[in-house]
Amino acid sequence: MKIILATSNKHKVLELKEILKDFEIYAFDEVLTPFEIEENGKTFKENALIKARAVFNALDEKQKKDFIALSDDSGICVDVLEGNPGIYSARFSGKGDDKSNRDKLVNEMIKKGFNQSRAHYVAAIAMVGLMGEFSTHGTMYGKVIDTEKGENGFGYDSLFIPKGFDKTLAQLSVDEKNNISHRFKALELAKIILKILTKG
């Protein structure tokens, strides 16, 4: 049994392949002609399931016997922004690029009179195959700051300091980040399900 990732985000593909290295993983565009998926769910879990279903349903009948579609939906929830950007994290600025999203988050926080805030990341993992639909989730707590620090990672990593650390995610090594991240926690649970589904 193989896994097709329901994402074309190169950063996510690399991170997912690293964490799921015990499995045979294919990026979306290695198996299918890429297509747009409308993420109109109201929660991370709903959006993850929408993406995994869309990719699984695009496979032909033979591929459906060989593949499980796996999707991640994740984002950052900032306390002083009443939980925003949340499920809109990837398109918070309306431009869809990481730098614009980070700039908007900092500007919104400063407008409210804060230069930092408690925040948490959420990741939902959805798996869809002939055996059914499954989902897991993970959370990472910490705070966001108003100044970018570090060169690693993507998204809001350069603004987020995990609880118990004095560095942003972008200042941590890949291994350090993967050991504490919301996505890692959700994927560790997903691995248990995948091991059962991929037997035989």
UniProtKB/Swiss-Prot annotation:
It catalyses: XTP + H2O = XMP + diphosphate + H(+); dITP + H2O = dIMP + diphosphate + H(+); ITP + H2O = IMP + diphosphate + H(+). GO terms for cellular component: cytosol. Homodimer. Belongs to the HAM1 NTPase family. Mg(2+) binds at residues 38, 73. GO terms for molecular function: dITP diphosphatase activity; ITP diphosphatase activity; metal ion binding; nucleotide binding; ribonucleoside triphosphate phosphatase activity; XTP diphosphatase activity. This is dITP/XTP pyrophosphatase. SUPFAM superfamilies: ITPase-like. Substrate binds at residues 7-12, 74, 154-157, 177, 182-183. GO terms for biological process: nucleotide metabolic process; purine nucleoside triphosphate catabolic process. The active site is at residue 73. Binds 1 Mg(2+) ion per subunit. Signal peptide: none annotated. Its cofactor is Mg(2+). The keyword Ribonucleoprotein does not apply. It holds the Pfam family Ham1p_like. It comes from the Bacteria. The keyword Chloroplast does not apply.
